[in-house]
């Protein structure tokens, strides 16, 4: 075996080879991580020239002939590689024979022993390259891999979420950023941006679309709920949720609670429960036990009936104090049968009128001042010899010659019937018809020298027979009844053939005691409320407590106007309806329309059609209708006078009037002292 080259020669050869290699090699740039792996503080074979030299020595020393461990040490020039090589070298000889056997597998086995990357111990999937070291090796890992053999996945997501703004998914040797639902991954593959789903008009269908971070919401108006299946807003039937204490009516997007107004109830501030309708203005309701109210019986029948019997001929003497604002009615009747002899003292146009019939011959006389001014005055009727004398405040206003006396002889006794506040027979039997109903008050009466003391005891025991101590002009509605008329609101114009025109003009002068109640209404067949004007203390659609006057056709409010109900003052409510027009005014201020022009015309057309049928005009309340048929069903409480189509309504001429309603007198507001 030739001697190995000396150290100086070997070093020179190595430097020359290194020089040649540096001239001919291409520049190689490694990433920082790869470079760092190469610069580990361990001895490495950095240059290929040393490997080639080592292989030459190895072939000469250990392949062509058997080498000892010391000779192998001279080849590798270090202990680690020698210690690694020599036991494996001996294993190659055991498996393939000695060098002199010339087995090619032996040569291959020996030549591969110094290269510790053959076979490659590094994980193939995670290794970029294997670096042979002195008795060792180094696995240069690909990005995302670690460990000695590059077989350990690096979890990039464990450090700052891998740089992902939302979701980091670790994968073998890698990772991937992802976004939550409703976000999209941007071009940097790390950032996420919200997706605006509302840019697609079909996202929510009929509902409003509101974009949210990573999502969206389909919104409906209050009272509606969104159906994701049909992509529409569907009405919520709140009435199925038992929200109302009494009656509930569902409507698109809302609901309305109703209370039994005729039972004295209205909606509470929560708009769901009911509460009592209580007066907010106190009226002076005190009555006098020494007074007799003449208007208690709407039928026109007398409130008092007396029958006198005498053994001797007797003359009539009647005296009383009287007070009224009523222009017409009967004070009292005295006499016998309708076809015999009698007198009726009444009022017509505010003046005293005497109708009399003696022996079948009737007469009428009227004289004296107007006395329906609401002040007390003393009236007397005295039967003298062949004369009747009528006085007002002791002044004679009438003196009528008569033939005979009012007491009639019958079965040996002289009889006289006397009735107060009405007549004992039909109006048609009068000399001239008169409305017998009289809203008047009588006191200090004296019939035939006081032989009627029982009347006073009867009046004391019955407050309905008593008068208010103080009254003013107007009609008083106590809140528990109504009146109605049969009025016509249509007419056929001769100028345009048979075309039917209609008009409803209402002027109501009111001084309310409560904030809820029907002022007037038109009611058709089957108790359908065609039109109503009423006080109400809430706005039904806005569900807001507010004192209002409402004009409605059936259950649809056409107009609303605010009113100070509880200020103790008189207010004027004006309503005008005709083709194409519906207005509501309170104290000269026009109300706000609640419907569109098309909706208004639709309601007016319906009203016009209904007015051509049977219609009753109700004042102060309604019959027993459904609470849902009109905005208000409660009775009105307070003072009111009413004009309809230019004519003042006289409650004495109504088709019906509740007996507690006073036609021409109203108690004043009670002034409460602090």
From Swiss-Prot:
Sugar attachment sites: 189, 417, 488
Residues annotated as binding Ca(2+): 326, 328, 437, 652
Residue ranges constituting the Gla domain according to the UniProt record: 50-91
Post-translational modification Phosphoserine, affected residues: 68, 614
Signal peptide positions (record): 1-27
Source superkingdom: Eukaryota
Keywords, alphabetical: Calcium, Disulfide bond, EGF-like domain, Gamma-carboxyglutamic acid, Glycoprotein, Growth regulation, Metal-binding, Phosphoprotein, Repeat, Secreted, Signal
Post-translational modification: Gamma-carboxyglutamate residues are formed by vitamin K dependent carboxylation. These residues are essential for the binding of calcium.
InterPro entries reported for this sequence: Coagulation_fac-like_Gla_dom, ConA-like_dom_sf, EGF-like_Ca-bd_dom, EGF-like_dom, EGF-type_Asp/Asn_hydroxyl_site, EGF_Ca-bd_CS, GAS-SHBG-PROS, GLA-like_dom_SF
Keyword Nuclease in annotation: no
Major location category of this protein: secreted
Keyword flag Phosphoprotein: yes
GO cellular component terms, semicolon-separated: cytoplasm; extracellular space
Gene Ontology terms for molecular function: calcium ion binding; cysteine-type endopeptidase inhibitor activity involved in apoptotic process; growth factor activity; phosphatidylserine binding; protein-macromolecule adaptor activity; receptor ligand activity; receptor tyrosine kinase binding; signaling receptor binding
Disulfide bond annotation, renumbered to this chain: 62-67, 117-130, 122-139, 141-150, 157-168, 164-177, 179-192, 198-209, 204-218, 220-233, 239-248, 244-257, 259-274, 280-566, 441-467, 639-666
Positions of post-translational Phosphotyrosine modification: 636
Annotated function: Ligand for tyrosine-protein kinase receptors AXL, TYRO3 and MER whose signaling is implicated in cell growth and survival, cell adhesion and cell migration. GAS6/AXL signaling plays a role in various processes such as endothelial cell survival during acidification by preventing apoptosis, optimal cytokine signaling during human natural killer cell development, hepatic regeneration, gonadotropin-releasing hormone neuron survival and migration, platelet activation, or regulation of thrombotic responses.
Quaternary structure (record): Heterodimer and heterotetramer with AXL.
Name used for this protein in its record: Growth arrest-specific protein 6
Natural source organism: Rattus norvegicus (Rat)
Encoding gene, per UniProt annotation: Gas6
